[in-house]
């Protein structure tokens, strides 16, 4: 999870997040190279009073500065499209979880099981136990199995929300009247925190998300206790 004075991403806990981190580094490298080239040209222009008359109307230069940006955009677009398709495509999910945003809490429904649904509210500060995280703990955590493909169906009952778990690379808008889909899969057991990432009213900051990813055996035991 995030910690104080953190300027980078959280550690990736899902394949999608790993791909997003690689894409971030790839894009940042291109931006750094372009910035270095621009600064170099500016420094040359400021340090010399000579005018290169041969390049003021050169067909070769115009060709280069037309083709080169197109190539750079392609180098950015191709991996981006690949990740978009990876995030959207899901075949035969092992589990489907429906998430509904409300002002100002989340409700969850395990669509593969009858009557397995609950609301998830932020735990008030006076009710926190030692070691709990302020503004991030909830009364009902979402328990999911690891190493399984999970389909998330996300919508809203009132206004726009956004269901976001940074470590898993998920940020999907919850829109009233629309059912959006996201893919969740991780091989790392742990507790992952997120929050609503769309300003949705006075208590927007009090809509935490807590996922508890456990091995399949413990998930089945949790189901037996809950159902």
Swiss-Prot record:
What is its membrane topology? Multi-pass membrane protein
Question: Which of this chain's residues are annotated to bind Mg(2+)?
Answer: 198
Top-level EC class as recorded in UniProt: translocase
* Catalytic activity, as annotated: 4 Fe(II)-[cytochrome c] + O2 + 8 H(+)(in) = 4 Fe(III)-[cytochrome c] + 2 H2O + 4 H(+)(out)
Query: Needs which cofactor?
Result: Cu cation
Record keywords, A-Z: Copper, Electron transport, Magnesium, Membrane, Metal-binding, Mitochondrion, Mitochondrion inner membrane, Phosphoprotein, Respiratory chain, Translocase, Transmembrane, Transmembrane helix, Transport
Query: What residues form the membrane-spanning segments?
Result: 15-45, 60-87
Query: Which residues are on the Mitochondrial intermembrane side of the membrane?
Result: 1-14, 88-227
Instruction: Give any Gene Ontology cellular component.
Output: respiratory chain complex IV
Residues bearing PTM Phosphotyrosine:
218
State the free-text cofactor note.
Binds a dinuclear copper A center per subunit.
| Positions bound to Cu cation A1 | 161, 196, 200, 207
- Stated EC number for the protein is 7.1.1.9
Instruction: List, alphabetically, the Gene3D superfamilies matched.
Output: 1.10.287.90, Cupredoxins - blue copper proteins
Compartments where located: Mitochondrion inner membrane
* Top-level taxon of origin: Eukaryota
* UniProt main location, coarse: mitochondrion
Q: Has the keyword NAD been applied to this entry?
A: no
- InterPro entries registered for this protein in UniProt: CcO_II, CcO_II-like_C, CcO_II_C, Copper_CuA, Cupredoxin, Cyt_c_oxidase_su2, Cyt_c_oxidase_su2_TM_dom, Cyt_c_oxidase_su2_TM_sf
The record's SUPFAM superfamilies line, in alphabetical order, gives: Cupredoxins, Cytochrome c oxidase subunit II-like, transmembrane region
Give the multimer and partner information: Component of the cytochrome c oxidase (complex IV, CIV), a multisubunit enzyme composed of 14 subunits. The complex is composed of a catalytic core of 3 subunits MT-CO1, MT-CO2 and MT-CO3, encoded in the mitochondrial DNA, and 11 supernumerary subunits COX4I, COX5A, COX5B, COX6A, COX6B, COX6C, COX7A, COX7B, COX7C, COX8 and NDUFA4, which are encoded in the nuclear genome.
Similarity-based family: Belongs to the cytochrome c oxidase subunit 2 family.
Name by which UniProt lists this protein: Cytochrome c oxidase subunit 2
Gene name per UniProt: MT-CO2
